[in-house]
Regions:
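Pocket-lining segment of extracytoplasmic ligand-binding domains
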Residues: 178-286
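Secondary-structure end/capping motifs
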Residues: 254, 259-334
Length: 358
C-alpha cells in the first residue's frame, strides 16, 4: 500500500516496558554500578571491550556486535541493555514523539559521509542527482540515518524535489524489513512498503532505478550493472564538508532512561570513557613504529585527515558537531521522520551539554 500525503506510517513492533534496575556491585569496598553495553566492533572502542579503558564508578559487561542492525532492532524492541549504540534516525524520531525510553550522550561511534550510498542501475541513464526525479528509488527504511542525510543533501545542495520520486521500502538483500518508528510523511511524498521483496531484487529487475542505502545492494560488484551516482564520492564528500561543516553522525550512544534517572552521573563518566578510548585509538593510528592496521601509509593518511579536519578529526561532544546535529534536526523534520522540529538541547541531557576543560 502506498502511503498517503501526511499519513503516519506505523512500525511493526512497539517498545518494551521498563526493565530491571542496574546492579550495585562491590569492587574492593567501593560501590560500583554494573551496566551492560552493546556496541559494534570498532577500533575506537576496542580498549573498552578489553577492559583497558574504564569509567569511574561503573563496572561494564561489554557485548560486541558485528552489525548495527541487530543492536538497533533488539534495543528499540526490547531494551535489552543498559547502554547501547543506536541509530541517530531512530533516536531522534522516538524523542520527537516523547516516547524515547533512552537518553543520548554525544558519543558518535559511527560517522560516515554518504555520497557513496547512492547506487543506480548502469543502464538507467542517471548521471546527475536531478535525474532521480521521476524515478523509483529503493530505501531500506525511510528513517535509516544514512538515507536521511542523503535526502537532505539531495534536496538542499542538489535541488532535488523529493516529491517527484517514488520511494519503495524493502530490505537491502532480504525481504521482510520494516520501519522501526512511526513516520509522519510530508505532503506529496509517495512511499510504498514492499515486504515481499528486496532492494537488490527490484534493482536487478528494473523495478527501481536507484537505491539509497548504507549497505551496498547485492548487484554492486564493480561489473557496471550497478554503479555509484558519485563515482568519485570522496571528492564530492570533501566539497560538501568544506561548504557545510557537516560530518554525518550515523550512530550515537544511549542510556536506558530508567538507568539514567537513577544515576545521572554515569552520562559524563561514560562520555569520558569513550573519548579516552578514541584518543588512544588515534595515537595508535598515527604511530609509524609498526603497522597498527594492515594498510600502507595508514599513519600518513591519519595525519592528512587531521590536517583537514583539525586536531580531533572525529569529535565527540556537542559544540564541535553542532552544525551536523542542527542539519540532521532540519533534515529529519523536513522529511517527516520527526513529529516536531527538534533542537540540539532536546536530544541530550544537561549533564553532558558542557565539558569541563583544564
Amino acid at each position: 500500500m502506498t502511503a498517503r500525503a501526511g499519513h503516519v506510517q506505523k512500525p511493526t513492533h512497539g517498545l518494551a516496558p521498563e526493565l530491571r534496575s542496574p546492579t550495585i556491585v562491590d569492587t574492593g569496598g567501593v560501590a560500583s554500578v554494573h551496566l551492560t553495553l552493546a556496541v559494534c566492533d570498532y577500533e575506537h572502542v576496542r580498549e573498552i571491550a578489553q577492559g583497558l579503558v574504564r569509567a569511574d564508578g561503573i563496572t561494564l559487561t561489554p557485548l560486541i556486535f558485528p552489525s548495527i542492525e541487530e543492536i538497533t532492532f533488539r534495543f528499540t524492541k526490547s531494551l535489552e541493555w543498559d547502554v547501547s549504540e543506536l541509530s541517530f534516525g531512530k533516536y531522534i524520531s522516538l524523542t520527537s514523539q516523547g516516547i524515547a525510553p533512552m537518553v543520548a550522550i554525544p558519543v558518535f561511534p559511527s560517522r560516515v559521509h554518504r555520497h557513496s550510498a547512492i547506487y543506480v542501475r548502469g543502464e538507467a541513464g542517471i548521471r546527475t542527482a536531478k535525474d532521480l526525479e521521476g524515478r523509483a528509488v529503493g530505501i531500506p527504511e525511510w528513517a535509516q540515518t544514512a538515507g536521511i542525510y542523503v535526502r537532505g543533501f539531495l534536496a538542499e545542495e542538489e535541488g532535488v524535489d523529493l516529491a517527484k520520486i517514488r520511494w519503495l521500502q524493502a530490505g537491502v538483500n532480504e525481504p521482510g524489513r520494516a520501519e522501526k518508528v512511526e513516520l509522519k510523511l510530508p505532503a506529496g511524498i509517495r512511499y510504498q512498503p514492499r515486504p515481499d521483496t528486496s532492494l537488490s531484487a527490484m534493482l536487478a529487475s528494473g523495478e527501481v532505478d536507484a537505491v539509497i542505502s548504507a549497505r551496498a545492494p547485492a548487484g554492486f560488484a564493480g561489473g557496471g550493472e550497478v554503479v555509484r551516482l558519485y563515482p568519485n564520492y570522496r571528492a564530492a564528500e570533501e566539497r560538501f564538508f568544506r561548504k557545510t561543516g557537516i560530518f554525518p553522525i550515523m550512530h550515537l550512544m544511549t542510556i536506558r532512561r530508567t538507568v539514567f534517572e537513577q544515576h545521572p552521573w554515569i552520562a559524563m563518566n561514560l562520555f569520558k570513557m569513550f573519548d579516552e578510548a578514541k584518543r588512544r585509538c588515534f595515537n595508535r593510528l598515527r604511530d609509524f613504529t609498526c603497522a597498527r592496521i594492515p594498510l600502507p601509509w595508514a599513519a600518513a593518511m591519519a595525519d592528512e585527515i587531521a590536517a583537514g579536519y583539525g586536531p580531533d578529526p572525529y569529535p565527540y561532544g556537542i559544540e564541535q558537531s553542532r552544525a551536523t546535529i542542527e542539519a540532521f534536526c532540519r533534515y529529519a523534520h523536513d522529511q517527516g521522520v520527526t513529529h516536531r522540529r527538534m533542537t540540539v538541547d532536546d536530544l541530550f541531557p544537561p549533564e553532558v551539554r558542557a565539558l569541563a576543560r583544564v
